[in-house]
C-alpha cells in the first residue's frame, strides 16, 4: 500500500469538499425556497388595497407579460374589526391594444390553488386573464391540516372504519389548533371568496368581468352571479357542480357506469372480455393480495372512482377511465396487478392532494345535504358503492368536526340568474355528470345554454382534448354570447390502452425488486472485495462514493417501501423516518466499504463506520425535508452522500497528520566491522 500523503488537503479532497459544499447549499436552498408563505399583509395596508408590479407568467405558449401583487381583505367580513389577510393576484395582460371584458378564472378543488393556469394563453389573446388567490389556500393564512394528512398517510386502508374515525378526530383537532392560533374559521367560506373576487374587480377598475370556472370552482361562479349580478357579464362553467353535489350520489354514478357499459358492449375488444361491464364491476371482488403484495380495498375503490372521472389519457395519464376499466377486467380474469397499482397510487397521492382545511370549509357549503345523505342508508347496492363520498366527508362526520360558519346555508339552494351562462359538460363525467347540471341548474338560467361533449369526462378532459375547439367555444361565447362547438369531434374510447395499469404495475414491481436486490447484493459484495483484496481501488471507490450512491440509495428506499407495503401497513410510504433509514443506512455502509482498508486498526475501522453511518443517516433525514416525495428521494440520497462522505473525509484529514508524524519504522543494515 502507498504511504499516505502528509498533506490533509490534497487536490482530490478539495474537489470532493467543493462538491459536498455545493450539494449542501442546493439542499439548503430547496428547504428555504419551499418554506413559509410568500404573501403577507403590507405594513399600513387597508382592506381593498391592491398593489401590483410588472412580472411574467408562464403559460403553455411561453412567458406572458403580467402584473403580480397582493390584495388585502378582511378575514371575516361578518366581524367588525376583523384582522386583515393578504391574497396573491396575477393579471395576465391581453395581447391586444383593445382588450375585451377581462376574465376571472376559478379553479376547482376544493383545497387546490387558483394561481396556476397554463391555459391562460388560450384566453389572453383578446382580454386580461385574472387569477385571484383563494383564501385558505393561496393567501397569508393557509388552512393546512397536518393532523388530517398524517391520519391519511398512516391509514391501513383509506376507507376503513378506523381511518374514518381518525379523519374526524384529526379535522376537529386541526380546527381547534387553527382557532387557538388566531384564525377566524368563520371567514373561510365561498361567499367570502366571492367577496374577494369583487374586491379585486373594484381595485382593478373593471366595470364588468367574465368568469371561466371548473368543477368546484363553478360553485363560486354561481354565487358570484347570484351575489353580484351586475358585475358579471358572462360566465362559462366547465364540469358544473350545483348546490348539494359535493356529495357523489351512487345512483347517478351508476348512470355513468352504464354509459361505459354501453360503449363496451359496442366495442369488440371490451365486449370479448365481459358480457356486461356494469355487472363485472359490481361483482368482481377486490383480492387481498397480488403475489406477496397486499391490496387495500378502500384505496382501490377510491382510486377507481377518481380514475373514471377523465376519459382521455392526455388528461389523466395512467389513471384514465379506459385504463381503470382495463384493470378491473384483468382482475376479473385473474390478474389483479392493476388494482394493486391503484391501491399504492391512492396511498401516495390522496394524503397530500388538497389543503384539507379548505376542503372542510368548502364542504360545509353542502352541510344540509350531507346531513341528509349520511343520516340514512346511503348506498343501496350500487355498482361502485359510495366509498369516495364517505372518504371525502369522513362518513359525514366532517360536518360536525369542522365548526359551522355564518355562510353555511346562504347558498344551499339554486337561485335564478339572468347572467348569460354556458354550461360545458362531458357526458362521461363521474364527478359532475351533465344530467345533474341539466336538471338542477339549467332551468334556473333564463339565458343559459348547455353543451354536452360526447365521450369526454371531467374538466381535465376539456382542457386536454382538442384545445383549439375548446378555445373557440369559450372565446366565442365570452365575446358574443354565441355557442359554437362546431370544431369538436367525438372522442373515441379506446378500451385497449397502450400502457395498461397491469403492465405498469409489473414494470414498477420489477424495477423495485431489481434495484432493491442490487443494493442488497452490493452490501454483500463490497465487504467481500475488501476482505479479499484489502480495499476497493481508487477509481472504483470514487465512482461508488459518487454516482453509485444514487443507485444504492434508490434501491434502499424501494426496498424500504416493499417492506412497508408487505409488513408495516400503517407506516406511510413517504415517511421521513422510512426514507431516512432506507436511504441513509445503505449509503452510509457503501461509503464505508469504499473507504476502508483491511490493514487499518480496529479502532479506525469502527470510527469510520460510525462516521459514515451517522453522516449518511443525518444527511438523508435532512435531505428528505428539502422537497416533497418523489423529489425528496433524490434530495435524501444527495444529503446522505454528502453527510457520509464529509465525515470520512474529515476523519482522513484528522488522522493523517497524526499518522505521518509518528516515527517511521525502518530496517537498517549492520555497520561493517
Where in this protein do the model-derived segments appear?
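Alpha/beta-hydrolase fold nucleophile elbow
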Residues: 206-216
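A catalytic-pocket lid/entrance helix-loop region that shapes and gates access to the active site
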Residues: 145, 150-155, 223-280, 304, ...
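Conserved acidic catalytic loop of the alpha/beta-hydrolase fold
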Residues: 179, 191-208
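Catalytic active-site module of serine/aspartate enzymes centered on a nucleophile-bearing elbow/loop
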Residues: 454-513, 657
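Conserved alpha/beta-hydrolase "acid-adjacent" motif
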Residues: 430-436
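Alpha/beta-hydrolase fold active-site neighborhood
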Residues: 10-16, 28-38, 277-419, 498-584, ...
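N-terminal cap/lid segment of alpha/beta-hydrolase-fold proteins
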Residues: 55-88
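N-terminal cap/lid subdomain of alpha/beta-hydrolase-fold enzymes
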Residues: 83-164
